Amino acid sequence: MPAEQRTALVTGGTGGLGEAIARALHDVGHTVLVVHSPGNASIGAWLEAQTDEGYNFIAYGADVADHASCQELAGLFQADCFLIEILVNNAGITRDATFRKLSYADWDAVLRVNLDSVFNVTRPFIDGMLERGWGRIVNIASINGSKGQF
């Protein structure tokens, strides 16, 4: 168990790597908030399955690619009395196409979710972390950031 229970936020926390990270943070005693895409129709079933396996997550829907949506999300956390102490920027998408076949819309979507989201989600919480003298920010990147498809 950690010396102190912290509040952790995991973007993209409802699938794959994000779910594994959320579970690991829960396993060491942290309160874990997960962010999923707005309108995710399966979030209720996902939360129920997690609860059945002993994981208690609190889920919020937000468009991490949208700055205003992330500001609203930060307001919800504040209203719900959560101070974000651990932030894992894990949200990411891919568009499975070679660069030559990639449309501008797909390019823009990938950059907004994979890159802009780091700023959008981190910005509302970094000042509080600095003021409290404690905080952790982990940024996850895809292999496509190092080895793209050309």
List each model region and its residues.
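Catalytic loop of short-chain dehydrogenase/reductase
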Residues: V138-F150
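Conserved NAD(P)H cofactor-binding loop of Rossmann-fold oxidoreductase domains
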Residues: N90-R95
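Substrate-binding pocket helix/loop in short-chain dehydrogenase/reductase
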Residues: T98-F99, D106-L111
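A short, exposed helix-loop element centered on a Lys and neighboring polar residues
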Residues: T122-R123
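The beta1-alpha1 cofactor-binding region of Rossmann-like NAD(H)/NADP(H)-dependent oxidoreductases
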Residues: G61-E72, Y104
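Conserved glycine-rich Rossmann-like NAD(P)H-binding loop of the short-chain dehydrogenase/reductase
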Residues: H30-A45
